[in-house]
Amino acid sequence: MDAERISHDGQLLQGASRPAGIDRLRRILTAYALTDSEVGYCQGMTDLCAPLLEVYPRDDQQAFDAFCGLMGRVRANFLGGMADMRRQLGLLGEVLGRLDARLHRHLVVIGAGSYVFAFQMLLLQLRREVAWADVFVLWETMWAREARLAAASGLPPAAAGRGAAVAETSQAQPPLQPQQQQQHQQYQELVPPPLQGAVRVDLRVFVVAAALLGQRAALLSCASMEEVVQFANHFPQPTNVVALVDQAERLFLKFGRLQRQRNGGSLSGCLRGGCTSSNGVELAAEEPMAAAFAGALPAQAQPGVTADGGDEHGAS
Amino acid sequence: MSTKKRRLLKVIILGDSGVGKTSLMNQYVQKKFTKEYKATIGADFLTKEIEVDDKKVTMQIWDTAGQERFQSLGSAFYRGADCCVLVFDVNNAKSFDDLDNWRDEFIIQAGPPDPDNFPFMVLGNKIDENGGSSRQVSEKKAKAWCASKGSIPYFETSAKEDINVEAAFTCITRNALRNEKEEELFMPDAVDMNTTATQRKRAGCC
């Protein structure tokens, strides 16, 4: 475990308090790896855990619980084969292809159409791209909006569909210590049951899409895949992360409308429902939300999704 | 001289996480070392313009994530590579054992036309650590592995102390340029991907 390879962001990971901060990170990540052996430890998890140290500056238990909750949302990102990351990259390409064909076409022409350059943004929920002070505003706003969209549509947020795997793998583990048992139980409670056949609200993909669209001119001026990779690795910090999530939500709804029109107003396997968008516009009652998930795969989808969409609703 | 075309050489650095890939790249290109590199997620690259044996070369050095789980995505950047640098930590036997996997994976993913003669290079890094007392892989063992894989050049390096870094990358450049020349001699009309593809297609049709 390379907990020490975390950036010097945040008060608890700087100067004299850094060694203690890194010790805490290591404890929490070790406890998590014990709880969830399928994921174990993976690089990038330190980036996700570090902000939690500051939210709970003294309480490891609370920080651990919060980290389990966070991992519940992004756990699939770290599973072997990176199938879910491929799915998200594919969805990102589909979203930009639908909402900004010129930009998407440009990226495809210069060889960046796989969107692998956005891998870090997606994996770490833009943790390295936004200012340290903005990380939690971004994440909490994103989670709240995702929950609202999910409630409105009757569909699960991105976290769903993973409980079974955790339960299965945990049975093969050696007996847990009382404290671990308690942590494990609390973790299990955070895991919603898998929802077979449903699709998810992947707002984070739309947040990344919004961030990329915010840098549209710069991306259009990139003449090669290499330039895009360098640009993405030194991505300009978004100045207003709440506005970024607002934009993501608008993109989400617009993408849904376009998908619905394209599919003639019917999408099999999706649920019906109405909702109000963030700017208070009442949406049509006929499955406006369901259509927005047209790019998302069913929860039980198998790995090996192609980078350009990959499901029955994928762009041709 | 000034009319000579500048060649672009794409170099891919591979190896387990924490062996010092990012540090080697930064020491070579930017002449600096810090212990504070974040774990590489995805991939990044740096370029350096050099002149070797009277040839102007732009080195494009790709640094990829070392954790095995990320390997399948890192390979998106292997295409078109002119050489591949395999790095291990001399104080970490597993990182040496994993060289086989990294080499095989690179050959599968990058698909060089002549894998047996593709220019690889092995760097045993962190030779400075604890004054050499924590070493787990001897120079002899590393050289034997390199010899068994078709005489891959081997350098012992320290990105931290800047030992052998420049020499290793200069050697890499020479080997890649030599390979390029041999390829040209071998198939004078098929130096770019499109020509090769057309030829292959033609061969398939007839």
Curated annotation (Swiss-Prot), chain B:
Which GO BP terms, alphabetically?
protein transport
Q: Which controlled-vocabulary keywords does the entry list?
A: Cell membrane, GTP-binding, Lipoprotein, Membrane, Nucleotide-binding, Prenylation, Protein transport, Transport
Map motif Effector region onto the chain: 37-45
Supply one GO molecular-function term.
GTPase activity
Answer yes or no on keyword Cell membrane.
Answer: yes
InterPro entries hit by this protein: P-loop_NTPase, Small_GTP-bd, Small_GTPase
Sites of S-geranylgeranyl cysteine lipidation: 205-206
- Kindly give the SUPFAM superfamilies that the UniProt entry links to this protein: P-loop containing nucleoside triphosphate hydrolases (SSF52540)
Q: Which residues form a coiled coil?
A: none
Q: Which domain of life is it from?
A: Eukaryota
Compartment(s) of residence:
Cell membrane
Binding site residues for GTP: 15-22, 63-67, 125-128
Function (record text)? Protein transport. Probably involved in vesicular traffic.
Q: So what family is this one in?
A: Belongs to the small GTPase superfamily. Rab family.
Enumerate the PANTHER family for this protein.
Answer: RAB FAMILY (PTHR47981), RAS-RELATED PROTEIN RAB-7A (PTHR47981:SF20)
Name of the protein: GTP-binding protein YPTC5
- The source organism is Chlamydomonas reinhardtii (Chlamydomonas smithii)
